[in-house]
Amino acid sequence: MQLVHGGDWAGYRAEFGRDALDFSANVSPLGLPEGVKNAIIRALPKADRYPDPLCRELRGKLAKTEGLPAEHILCGNGAADLIFRLALAAKPKKALLPAPSFAEYSSALETVGCELKRHILQESDDFAVTERFLDDIDKSVDVVFLCQPNNPTGQLTDLAMVERILRRCKECGAV
């Protein structure tokens, strides 16, 4: 199985013979800012080493800033990495997610054999998560994935709705 997250500029160029503006990943069409280029140059002497896989220094600084134990902080190589780690750690049996939504959720969940329950967002609701989403959260659902803002629709779920979703998850034992 081959999972493609996005940002496949080489595939697009090979298929169409030209470059495209790609908004499928957090890639800037403007190139690297000078500050980032300078940081890369400063980091070159350490480029022959893998970074600390446990991110000890980063977790320590975040813990101090946030007033939390470092053990409560998980760092990863982007959101997709963290989503896969969550799926591998929790191994849920059944998950609820809005559709369409960020493809990494379903990819990660399918990797661990999780059954997917998709709540189809309606064009008539401007593809927003509505009260009907709550009806799909029941005791058979172990985990609910909600993207904020939703990807690819760009819709924000208002705080009151997020709070209702959290309450419903708590009632049903879902995370």
Where are these regions (language model features)?
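N-terminal "arm"/small-domain region of PLP-dependent enzymes with the aminotransferase-like
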Residues: 1-49, 146
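PLP-dependent aminotransferase-like
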Residues: 88-146
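Short, well-ordered alpha-helices that flank and scaffold nucleotide-derived cofactor binding pockets
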Residues: 38, 42, 64, 84, ...
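Glycine/Thr-rich phosphate-binding loops of Rossmann-like dinucleotide-binding domains
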Residues: 31-33, 83-84, 105-106, 153-154
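Short active-site oxyanion
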Residues: 46-49, 71-72, 92-95
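Short glycine-rich anion-binding loops that position phosphate/pyrophosphate groups of nucleotides
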Residues: 26-29, 79-80, 102, 148-153
